[in-house]
Curated annotation (Swiss-Prot):
Bridged cysteine pairs (disulfide): C6-C29, C20-C26, C25-C50, C38-C57
Subcellular location(s) per record: Secreted
Expression by tissue: Expressed by the venom gland.
Similarity annotation: Belongs to the disintegrin family. Dimeric disintegrin subfamily.
Keyword Secreted assigned: yes
Function of the protein: Poor inhibitor of platelet aggregation. When it dimerizes with EO4A, it inhibits the adhesion of cells expressing the RGD-dependent integrin alpha-5/beta-1 (ITGA5/ITGB1) to immobilized fibronectin. When it dimerizes with EO5A, it inhibits the adhesion of the alpha-4/beta-1 (ITGA4/ITGB1) integrin to VCAM-1. When it dimerizes either with EO4A or EO5A, the inhibition on alpha-IIb/beta-3 (ITGA2B/ITGB3) is low.
Record's miscellaneous remark: When it dimerizes either with EO4A or EO5A, there is no inhibition on alpha-1/beta-1 (ITGA1/ITGB1), alpha-2/beta-1 (ITGA2/ITGB1) and alpha-6/beta-1 (ITGA6/ITGB1).
Renumbered ranges of motif Cell attachment site: 42-44
Domain Disintegrin residue range list: 1-65
A GO MF term: toxin activity
Subunit details: Heterodimer with EO4A or EO5A; disulfide-linked.
Organism encoding this protein: Echis ocellatus
Protein name (record): Disintegrin EO5B
Amino acid sequence: NSAHPCCDPVTCQPKKGEHCISGPCCRNCKFLNSGTVCKRAVGDDMDDYCSGITTDCPRNPYKGKD
């Protein structure tokens, strides 16, 4: 069983100097840049973009209500 390369095995938190462990806006232990598409549009929808400060893929604020 190998440890995740971004995770401190003792604390289960990102290693020093790393931003994240996993998520749609995390790659190679770093947050993806602001404006990186994290969810492509389907139909009349609009793309969702990473914020650059979190691993979440926030919903595009200009989308209509579900």
